[in-house]
A protein has these predicted regions:
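Glycine/threonine-rich beta-strand-loop-alpha-helix active-site module
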Residues: 83-196
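Flexible, glycine/charged-enriched surface loops at secondary-structure junctions
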Residues: 227-237, 252-264, 278-284, 338, ...
Length: 431
């Protein structure tokens, strides 16, 4: 594991250089980061009781560096409701800060990204619709000859990778539907993740975050063309991330105060954030956007990905062989390396998917949609309809073999029905 930790650290340093500080007890660099953009900032940080010690530490650092806090704002609710984004955008417009400093998890940082876009590029109209999809923010910024405010992100939860990635979600609560902005221009200019901050995270939050990070790496690994120039880098980032989570998460769930395991999971999910800059997520992430009112995002992705593994299997056979090695301890011992090597793609996909489910069971994680309270068949219809939305088309294109909206009913519905019951016998494959 030490070698994997060193590899993860090197990959992250090669990616972000001096713009990202990570490790244990590394918050002090915040003052220098914020000072690069001016002598004042808008501070976003939770006012909940759990954050009191962290808030004091952040305030002390900013005061020591003579940085004026123009306003202090509470963090977004989970899943970044659009109302929270608009509220924050209005505060940004009224305070005119030199920078935005956001201390929080993925939802809080996503909210800061979204609000920055609104306040900077649409100050007279609180409408995010023009920015949804891929590359829309940069295009509009260039057309209007405007720039976003500098954003410094201080991550507090392992999982989303929002502090080092180009993605930002927002939820339309009335429709119970999540949407996505994906553009490298919204990536925070500076980021910090002191993994010791995660020591107090409860077990469910810890697991869901880790599985979210794993899903980023897994889906991007699946969707990246093995003949592409970047493939070797993608493979290294994704497989390092996945293997660290598969090895360390069961240990961490039994020892939540173990700083070594916390660091491993932090590094691994950070690699998932790095992966988001190298490629895009696909099926499970797409469907998770329609399940926000009954389960967390990470939980939805974790349940769905084994079934997409089977669906994608005929297009990713060589990738599955490497995943079989990572999940080896969760594979039936009767399957020797020689026997695994001789399996056809579909059988290999089922074997790896069953190993993923065995891993989930090891950490007391649900393995099918029917186990989730509140789930019913209407959610399958909702996921199918959302998959046809042009704003989410990139998720279909990111599949190992891209789907079009007109093929969603034929190919995606059987996968979702399988995920409902835990049955891998569906006939359709992606090719």
């Amino acid at each position: 594991m030490k070698e994997k930790v060193r590899e993860a650290q090197k990959l992250l340093k090669d990616y972000k250089g001096k713009d990202y500080t990570f490790g244990i007890n590394c918050l002090d660099v915040l003052g220098n980061y914020v000072s690069e953009f001016g002598n004042n900032t808008l501070l976003i940080i939770s006012n909940s009781g759990w954050a009191k010690p962290l808030r004091k530490k952040i305030m002390d650092i900013l005061n020591k560096n003579e940085i004026k806090i123009l306003a202090e704002v509470d963090t977004s609710a989970p899943n970044t409701p659009v109302g929270d984004v608009i509220k924050l955008a209005n505060i940004i417009k009224s305070t005119h800060p030199d920078s935005i400093t956001c201390v929080g998890g993925g939802s809080a940082i996503d909210c800061a990204k979204d609000a920055n876009v609104l306040a900077s590029l649409s100050p007279d109209r609180n409408d995010l619709e023009p920015f949804f999809g891929v590359g829309r923010v940069r295009k509009i910024a260039q057309e209007k000859n405007k720039k976003l405010l500098p954003l410094v992100a201080v991550e507090v939860a392992s999982g989303s990778g929002s502090h080092i990635s180009k993605n930002a979600n927002v939820t339309y609560t009335e429709k119970k539907q999540k949407k996505l902005i994906s553009d490298d221009i919204i990536t925070p200019q500076k980021a910090i993740f002191d993994y010791s901050v995660t020591l107090t995270a409860p077990v469910d939050l810890t697991i869901d975050g880790a599985i979210d990070g794993l899903a980023h790496s897994l889906e991007i690994y699946y969707g990246t063309d093995s003949s592409s120039i970047e493939y070797k880098k993608v493979e290294k980032v994704c497989l390092t991330s996945i293997s660290m989570i598969v090895d360390a998460l069961p240990l961490l769930t039994g020892d939540l105060a173990n700083i070594k395991y916390r660091e491993i999971i932090g590094l691994a999910t950070d690699l998932g954030g790095y992966a988001l800059m190298l490629g895009g997520t696909n099926g499970a992430h797409l469907n998770s956007f329609s399940l926000i009112d009954i389960m967390t995002h990470g939980r939805a992705c974790g349940i769905l990905n084994p079934y997409y593994t089977v669906f994608f299997s005929t297009a990713i056979k060589n990738k599955l062989k490497k995943l079989a090695g990572i999940y080896k301890k969760y594979i039936d011992r009767r399957y020797t390396e020689e026997r695994i090597a001789n399996l056809n793609a579909r059988k290999l996909g089922e074997l790896v998917a069953k190993a993923m489910i065995a891993f989930s069971e090891k950490i007391n994680f649900p393995t099918k949609l029917s186990e989730i309270e509140g789930f019913n068949d209407s959610y399958i219809d909702k996921m199918i309809e959302a998959a046809k939305n042009p704003q989410l088309e990139m998720k279909l294109k990111n599949m190992p073999v891209p789907l079009s909206a007109k093929l969603v009913d034929e190919y995606m519905r059987p996968v979702l029905l399988a995920a409902k019951t835990g049955d891998f016998s569906f006939k359709k494959n992606i090719v």
